[in-house]
């Protein structure tokens, strides 16, 4: 398959031209169903809507049709990182400090290859997690094979998109919707 770093260099300017930040570029599916996955987001909202996905997909397709950087047939998938998003950039650790993450390591650290915990701190070289029953664990970023946010009520609340189009009134903590929910009336 094609070199991810080289593909990222081609995709990044297309995302930037639309005001988007790349979150991840990856190949999945193997030879039977090769898929180039591109995750991007708006830096101000950390989200991506359908129009953004369509625009970025068209720009990438046009660029790849011109340069043909991938020899074999593949499927292009452009999406938002989602709520339980991967943590792929140094800035992600600071942006999501205080939220829970699952970190999988390339090699064991203190006899473990996976840690689930709250993101406590990051310094660009490592991340510190508050891990239940272990306390704080500091993991060098270079040892992380993959990491993602863990879906929690706090994460759902923090990332819920709120469209008020056509809404007359916003009622928070509506009793028939449950505590912490927002009901739009209009």
Swiss-Prot record:
GO terms for cellular component: cytosol. It comes from Rhizorhabdus wittichii (strain DSM 6014 / CCUG 31198 / JCM 15750 / NBRC 105917 / EY 4224 / RW1) (Sphingomonas wittichii). GO terms for biological process: ribosomal small subunit assembly; translation. This is Ribosome maturation factor RimP. SUPFAM superfamilies: YhbC-like, C-terminal domain, YhbC-like, N-terminal domain. The gene is rimP. Keywords: Cytoplasm, Ribosome biogenesis. It holds the Pfam family RimP_N. Belongs to the RimP family. It is found in: Cytoplasm. The keyword Cytoplasm applies.
């Amino acid at each position: 398959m094609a070199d991810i770093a080289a593909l990222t260099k081609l995709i990044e300017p297309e995302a930037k031209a639309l005001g988007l930040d790349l979150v991840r570029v990856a190949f999945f599916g193997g030879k039977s169903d090769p898929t180039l996955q591109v995750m991007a987001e708006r830096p101000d909202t950390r989200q991506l809507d359908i129009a953004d996905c369509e625009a970025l997909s068209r720009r990438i397709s046009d660029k790849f049709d011109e340069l043909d950087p991938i020899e074999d047939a593949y499927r292009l998938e452009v999406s938002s990182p989602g709520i339980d998003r991967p943590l792929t950039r140094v800035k992600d650790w600071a942006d999501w400090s205080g939220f829970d993450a699952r970190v999988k390591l390339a090699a064991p650290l203190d006899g473990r290859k996976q840690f689930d915990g709250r993101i406590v701190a990051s310094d660009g070289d490592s991340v510190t997690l508050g891990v239940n029953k272990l306390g704080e664990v500091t993991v060098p970023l270079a040892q992380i094979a993959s990491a993602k946010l863990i879906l929690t009520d706090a994460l759902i609340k923090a990332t819920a998109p709120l469209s008020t189009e056509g809404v007359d009134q916003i009622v928070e903590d509506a009793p028939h919707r449950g505590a912490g929910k927002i009901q739009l009336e209009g």
